């Protein structure tokens, strides 16, 4: 009888612990310190966010990833989905990761991180450990991609289209001479926005 009572007590304790841990746990689509607001919350000035404030494009997993600063891209609506589109040159180390991975993130920071973004865009992760002195703290997202705790906005995207820009498709021929004198045309990636986290 004593053993039966002890077993019942243990079962009740375990059930209570499980219920409490479920209550305390961060939901699967949440990141500690951030709120998953969804794409409809993106009412910021996107041209300013990307074009002048800059962003970090990151691809890979928490054990092996690379990131680069970018100021070309956009957000919009395509194929009945909320999307982000980004451009990565083939010689960039990040290109290897965006080619291989199913997901990538775009992270946006306060102005105080400008110097870090400048550094992330001027050195290659192929030759240097960009994270070493960056002061950034990587974190894993819902789908296993990488973002940073210091970000103010994290956008997680599922890659749904990739294509290399083609010289013959440019209607403004001066652009190819000005932007691509070496012929290193960007790869364009379209990603479905699957998560948006804000502080």
What are these regions (language model features)?
Residues 21-199:
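Active-site-proximal mixed secondary-structure blocks
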């Amino acid at each position: 009888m004593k053993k039966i009572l002890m077993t019942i007590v243990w079962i009740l304790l375990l059930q209570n612990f499980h219920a409490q841990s479920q209550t305390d746990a961060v939901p699967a689509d949440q990141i500690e310190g951030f709120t998953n607001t969804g794409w409809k919350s993106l009412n910021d000035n996107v041209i300013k966010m990307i074009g002048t404030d800059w962003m970090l494009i990151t691809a890979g997993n928490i054990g092996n990833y690379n990131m680069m600063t970018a100021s070309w891209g956009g957000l919009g609506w395509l194929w009945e989905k909320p999307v982000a589109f980004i451009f990565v040159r083939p010689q960039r180390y990040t290109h290897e990761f965006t080619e291989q991975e199913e997901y990538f993130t775009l992270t946006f920071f306060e102005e105080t991180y400008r110097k870090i973004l400048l550094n992330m865009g001027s050195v290659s992760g192929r030759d240097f450990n960009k994270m070493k002195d960056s002061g950034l703290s990587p974190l894993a997202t819902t789908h296993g991609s990488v973002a940073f705790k210091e970000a103010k906005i994290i956008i997680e995207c599922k890659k749904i289209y990739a294509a290399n820009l083609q010289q013959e498709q440019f209607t403004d021929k001066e652009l190819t001479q000005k932007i691509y004198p070496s012929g290193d045309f960007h790869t364009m990636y379209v990603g479905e926005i699957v998560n948006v986290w804000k502080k």
